[in-house]
């Protein structure tokens, strides 16, 4: 990917089979930055108080997925919403880090958690939904 012009990327795969950073188990990372490749492992407990089970996060359809995302970005009315918020935050934190908006993963995760807690993340999702609807109707 570096030969294709990428400046900073992370390729991730968790021990539980996710192709994203997991809150349940170790995640293997290959990070390319400034022309150098490094490999390391991320532990979810380095970002949150403890590892979380992925139980309750699998969804059957788009309606269930939307409900879980709304809960995760909102009041987190149940344990699944809180776990989903952590999963969103750790992966959004990685994106913020790779994009250069955060100095490191820890800062990226904190920024993502702040956006979720303040309602900013949910507002941005609502903006995207409105934009998408306007484009479909337009």
Each model region followed by its residue ranges:
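Glycine-rich anion-binding loops and their surrounding alpha/beta cores
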Residues: 1-138
């Amino acid at each position: 990917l570096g030969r294709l012009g990428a400046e900073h990327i992370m390729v991730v795969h968790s021990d539980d089979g996710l192709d994203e950073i997991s809150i349940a188990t170790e995640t293997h990372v290959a990070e390319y930055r400034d022309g150098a490749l490094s490999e390391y492992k991320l532990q979810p407990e380095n970002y949150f108080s403890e590892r979380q089970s992925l139980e309750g996060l699998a969804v059957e359809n788009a309606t269930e997925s939307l409900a879980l995302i709304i809960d995760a970005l909102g009041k987190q009315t149940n344990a699944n919403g809180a776990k989903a918020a952590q999963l969103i935050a750790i992966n959004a934190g990685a994106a913020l880090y790779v994009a250069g908006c955060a100095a490191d993963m820890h800062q990226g995760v904190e920024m993502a958690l702040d956006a979720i807690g303040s309602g900013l993340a949910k507002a941005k999702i609502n903006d995207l939904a409105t934009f998408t609807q306007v484009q479909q109707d337009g």
